[in-house]
Amino acid sequence: MDNKLEKMKELVEELNQYAYEYYVLDNPSISDKEYDLKYDELVILEKKTEVTLPYSPTQRVGDKILGEFSKYTHKGRLWSLDKAQNMEQLIEWHNRNLKVIEQYNSMSEDKLPELRYIVTKKFDGLTVNCTYDENGILIKSATRGTGIIGEDITAQIKTIKTVPLKIKNNHIIEVHGEAIMTKTAFEEYNKAAQVPLKNLRNGAAGALRNLDIKETARRNLSAFFYDVGYNEGSEFKNYREMMNFIRNMGLPQDKYIKECTNMEEVEKEIEYIESIREELDYDIDGAVIVVDDIKTREILGYTIKFPKWAIAYKFEAKEITTRLLDVEWNVGRSGRVTPTALLEPVELGGVTVKRATLNNMDDIKRKNVKLGAKVLVRRSNDVIPEIMGVAEESLEESKEIQAPDRCPYCNSHLVQNGVHYYCENTLSCKPQMVKSIVHFASREAMNIAGFSEKTAEQLFEKLDIKSIADLYKIKKEELLTLEKFKDKKSQNLINAIQNSKNCDLASFIYALGIPNVGKKTANDLVMKFKTLESIKNTTIEQLVEVPDVGEIVAKSIYDFFEDEKIISNIEELLNLGVKPYYEEERIDENPFMDKTIVVTGSLNNYSRGEIKDKLQSLGAKVSSSVSKNTDYVLVGEKPGSKYEKAIELGVKVINEEEFSNKIK
């Protein structure tokens, strides 16, 4: 038995190496026939021993249908990227980076290096996260999902022959990549498919979101990896070092990786990538530009959605012509009435387009858009398509688009304000009230569990809810009269509404629906002004001092709290028991408060993310590099060069046991 197991291990190692040479390096060292003979020998041994190694190439064969997708919590967050539509926006991003670095260097002896960027292609596929354990074995693969929680697609990823099932690494890591379908694989699949695929991206996404693993395998996906999102091993100094690590682990990586020292070089590389776009065997939709130095990334930081040290440059979208059939007028949460174009269905960028934005009547007139005309439609950055203009020859049989004078929902007279039309019937205009209630109850706002748009519609139509404050007056017996509301569901909603009364101030500010104020801005307002009363009474001059708040947003906030109806509504909420609170985090006195600490090596009781959170909760600043300004270096097993640097500089070194004793 032992001899057979040893032979199996030998065959698995050989076959995985041959697969890497064939699929990743495109440089096979043996013939297909030799490979097949070794593969068949492995299959026979696995049947005889009833043992299959977790990284055996036989595990790539899709021969099962899964019941459902389970959730997976990523160890490290998968961030989205901010987008630049043109070089002006890209240069603005670059200038913001320069400003932060200059400010940091002027205040710190530990200077940041000159700004360098790495430019890569932006693949148009599906983002995936692969987790390898301390033995180097692929143990989990997942979709991006929310960035924090994704769906387990381990079985699907194992069908991708370029993704190694085992790597030579002895620490837990998560690597991020893009699963793609090549044009070659797309054409081969469609030759035999009963229902042909429409585009490469849907081909890849559909394969990974398919519970039939055989179907996933048939699509013959590929992948490129470009980021280490979680790492319990030695830290990287820069992105080039990270990319070298990814390549040395045998993970497939695109060969195009360019280092740039200025924006002229970045622009040149973007132009080059766009010039070869059509020649590639896979789809790309732009370029990704990231800061090379890891410490600089830490200083630049993050927004709620994006890292500030990376940006995607999106290529100009493709355009297509179709016919405008009609215009639909919709009412938003603010009462603004906006036109939406109803189009003759057409394929654009892999999506069937039936609707497009028209913005407002001024936009319609400026573009000379008319009913029945052929219009030029552009779809860009996964947002709703936009009408860019009309085909002049189609205007002869077209009709003018008439601006509405009454609300399409409540029939109230509309009021024009600038280029927009508004319905001022805030109390009985259904879409306004319903959308306001849904926003107020949403998870990031008051977090009223079990609340849906259908519920909001019933509250408006059946219970005559005319303001947000009315939510807190609802009685259980009233809910029981609504469709699908039994005793338990009614009581749960009553409980959720009551529980929402104690909410943090930032969530309450966001819930109010102030124009142009998202959750991040709400958080920033609370951090700056501390109380609801202070925010209500602030001036435009004070508001523009808040990070990322310009004059337009400042005026929106100021005007919002000048509205007597809004102030009255807020006061009613407070009188009904809503108690928004703000608590500044209090940190007890401890040896690490206000100290700069560097962590190196593996700790027994903390992952890298956990120790960082723990130190920050103690009021410490966690740094990625050792300098004379470092107060402590916390050392675990197998420390890296940071330990040597600490000894060299005379920085105090402590182990995990000493750390634990100090915080008891």
Swiss-Prot record:
Listed EC numbers: 6.5.1.2
Keywords: DNA damage, DNA repair, DNA replication, Ligase, Magnesium, Manganese, Metal-binding, NAD, Zinc
Gene3D superfamilies: 5' to 3' exonuclease, C-terminal subdomain, BRCT domain, DNA ligase/mRNA capping enzyme, Helix hairpin bin, Nucleic acid-binding proteins
Binding site for Zn(2+): C407, C410, C423, C429
Gene name tied to this protein: ligA
Domain BRCT: 587-664
PANTHER family: CHROMOSOME TRANSMISSION FIDELITY FACTOR 18, DNA LIGASE
GO cellular component, one term: cytosol
Known cofactor(s): Mg(2+); Mn(2+)
Function in brief: DNA ligase that catalyzes the formation of phosphodiester linkages between 5'-phosphoryl and 3'-hydroxyl groups in double-stranded DNA using NAD as a coenzyme and as the energy source for the reaction. It is essential for DNA replication and repair of damaged DNA.
Keyword check for NAD: yes
Name assigned to this protein: DNA ligase
Gene Ontology BP, a term: DNA repair
Residue positions binding NAD(+): D32, K33, E34, Y35, D36, S80, L81, R144, E178, K314
Stated family: Belongs to the NAD-dependent DNA ligase family. LigA subfamily.
Catalytic reactions on record: NAD(+) + (deoxyribonucleotide)n-3'-hydroxyl + 5'-phospho-(deoxyribonucleotide)m = (deoxyribonucleotide)n+m + AMP + beta-nicotinamide D-nucleotide
Catalytic-site annotation from UniProt: K122
Record-linked InterPro entries: BRCT_dom, BRCT_dom_sf, DisA/LigA_HHH, DNA_ligase, DNA_ligase_CS, DNAligase_adenylation, DNAligase_N, Hlx-hairpin-Hlx_DNA-bd_motif
Enzyme class: ligase
Entry's Gene Ontology molecular function annotations: DNA binding; DNA ligase (NAD+) activity; metal ion binding
